[in-house]
Amino acid sequence: AQYTEYVRQMPHSDDPKQVERVREVCQRVADAATSYLRKNNLNDLAQQMKWEFTVIADRRVNAFCMPGGKIVIYTGILPLCATDAELATVVSHEVSHAIARHSNERLSTEILRQMGGRVLVSAVGSTSAITNTVIQQAYGLGSQVLVSLPYSRKQEHEADQIGLVFMAMAGYNPEQAISFWKKMAQQGGGSTSELLSTHPSDANRIKAIGEYLPKALPYYQEYLAQQKVEQPKTPSTPAKDKKDTNRKPTNKKKSKKKSTKK
């Protein structure tokens, strides 16, 4: 309900190709995240993720994922995403925050502050009923609370690491995450960049991502290997025809025609 209300208030992108691109990348990352959860026996959490994707027409450099897998991408961040892998960096990072329930942590902290230090049970790792209560209370403070509250450096570090794995599993080269965050670092503290105000992007962060890449790359290599195995199986005979028409078949056909004429 909160997601629907927020999205309803914002202008949507009217560029079909832009929306299609974002949704395709979001879907692949969401599928990878769901697959990861199921493989690690986190089926309950996987079922809680009711994925939805929205592209907001706004010049601000921003993106976020609300609890339950509601992904919002601002058009202002797309110029920084020259490749789909760079866009996947953004999406997987935000999805990781949702999977790790970081928003619930910051919501409970903010509610506790707003209520003057009153005791509040943390939503993290607790029942869905408590989680829902926390979210509802937070939205009672204003629809911008979840969007504007900053993550801690620890949460950012976790989202960076988990995000690299998710994008790699989705078939996007995690090495391109470095190029994206370098662009973000060059953005500086401009007023149009909301993402930078909550996502520290500095040399230390980029260095940490580089150090974690060796752990994420095997997931990407596994994806590529699986694609090579699956491609010949699906098209079977058509696949052979396509390979033949690339180089060898054309030459063979010409040589046959010449031989028959002679």
Language model feature labels by segment:
Residues A1-K262:
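A Zn2+-metalloprotease active-site environment signal
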